[in-house]
């Protein structure tokens, strides 16, 4: 698959899907074997199958959405096995699948809220208001919600709730909105496996098409964690309507894995949880590296903010130097802006497709940028600006390999 990088632009999931279609034809996603599709994903990240497998299972911000959306893919596969017309919608809306013309919202249980046969599900919106305190729009309105709620109970045996939206529990303060989280009791419920409400008969469905096998999985850890075949996992990631799994989650964790791999190759000792070295704000850096004089250097790992980059002409590489959540202010705990004392170096990890695009080769490129080179916030001078930009010359100046890492970190 050496031609893959000729079609990849920025390495987003839409680019990978487009590349596979260019190489193998427009029906590539449905006709290609799982090994070829997984190879494309791993080549894009410069990881092998085992590294990719561990990336998913060892990082809950990745595993959690993979589990949720894999349920949608698995249920769709089961429905298609008995020729039920089904359309995947996905994304951030109120509808995940359209089944026999019925709109359905699919959810996996929130395990922390489950006990025995009583299962808890969260249906609140993941974008917009962050809680009921901020706005009741945090909850879905009954009017806009899907016709049916489909909640996973178990894969083996395959059991789900199929509940008409009018029967879902409402918010106490506003009966026009659906409560989240809410609980359903699988013991004696009249809504367990009520596929007839969707106009569906699954008596002859092929449930084995989704189940993981013990000895034959390319992603054995993830398959074990989800109970699903590697093929279902890979197709979940290659679902463009749920691009956030790859673009905003998997790629971010891949950068840390790639950098740690480089550090190990260079023989540089590091701590993966800097809070154990520096309790106060240690969590605002990603790695702590110990030099020859027993001094810790704190490193913040970032990637390219593709939408803010310019790759052609007068090249500009941009990266966000701010936390995922919070507000732009100087509050000691609620600000999303980093303090200038939070880390000593910014490790800009440039993904293989972008590295290839800007002439640095089809592998990871690492830039180790001293914090003194970063721009400060215009209003809050004790914090870094939200966005940092670098020219091609800057990238070449700060780019380091194993030797550079040793010199910069161990001798500084």
Language model regions located:
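Nucleic-acid endonuclease domains
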Residues: 1-99, 107-284, 290-297, 303-412
């Amino acid at each position: 698959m050496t031609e893959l990088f000729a079609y990849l632009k920025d390495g987003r999931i839409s680019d990978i899907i487009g590349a596979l279609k260019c190489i193998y034809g427009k029906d590539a996603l449905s006709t290609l074997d799982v090994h070829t599709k997984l190879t494309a994903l791993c080549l894009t990240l410069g990881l092998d199958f085992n590294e990719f497998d561990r990336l998913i299972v060892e990082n809950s911000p990745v595993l959690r959405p993979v589990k949720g959306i894999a349920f949608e893919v698995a249920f769709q596969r089961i429905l298609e096995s008995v020729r039920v017309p089904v359309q995947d919608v996905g994304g951030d809306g109120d509808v995940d699948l359209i089944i026999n013309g019925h709109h359905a919202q699919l959810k996996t249980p929130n395990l922390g809220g489950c006990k025995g046969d009583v299962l808890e599900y969260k249906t609140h919106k993941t974008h917009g208001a962050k809680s009921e305190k901020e706005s009741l729009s945090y909850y879905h309105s009954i009017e806009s919600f899907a016709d049916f709620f489909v909640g996973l109970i178990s894969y083996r045996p395959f059991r789900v709730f199929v509940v008409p939206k009018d029967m879902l529990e409402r918010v106490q303060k506003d009966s026009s909105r659906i409560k989240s989280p809410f609980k359903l009791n699988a013991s004696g419920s009249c809504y367990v496996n009520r596929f007839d409400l969707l106009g569906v008969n699954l008596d002859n469905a092929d449930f084995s098409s989704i189940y993981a096998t013990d000895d034959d999985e390319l992603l054995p850890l993830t398959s074990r964690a989800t109970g699903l075949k590697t093929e279902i996992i890979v197709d979940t990631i290659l679902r463009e309507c749920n691009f956030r799994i790859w673009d905003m989650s998997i790629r971010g964790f891949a950068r840390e894995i790639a950098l740690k791999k480089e550090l190990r190759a260079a023989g540089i000792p590091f701590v993966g949880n800097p809070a154990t070295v520096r309790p106060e704000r240690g969590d605002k850096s990603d790695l702590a590296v110990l030099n020859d004089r027993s001094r810790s250097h704190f490193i913040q790992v970032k990637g390219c903010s593709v939408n803010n980059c310019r790759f052609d002409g007068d090249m500009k590489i941009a990266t966000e130097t701010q936390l995922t959540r919070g507000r732009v202010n100087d509050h000691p705990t609620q600000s999303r802006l980093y303090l200038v004392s939070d880390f000593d170096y910014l490790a800009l990890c440039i993904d293989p497709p972008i590295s290839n695009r800007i002439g640095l080769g089809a592998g990871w490129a690492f830039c180790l940028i001293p914090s003194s080179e970063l721009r400060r916030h215009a209003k809050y001078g004790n914090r870094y600006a939200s966005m940092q930009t670098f020219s091609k010359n800057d990238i070449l100046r700060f780019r380091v390999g194993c030797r550079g890492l040793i010199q910069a970190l161990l001798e500084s």
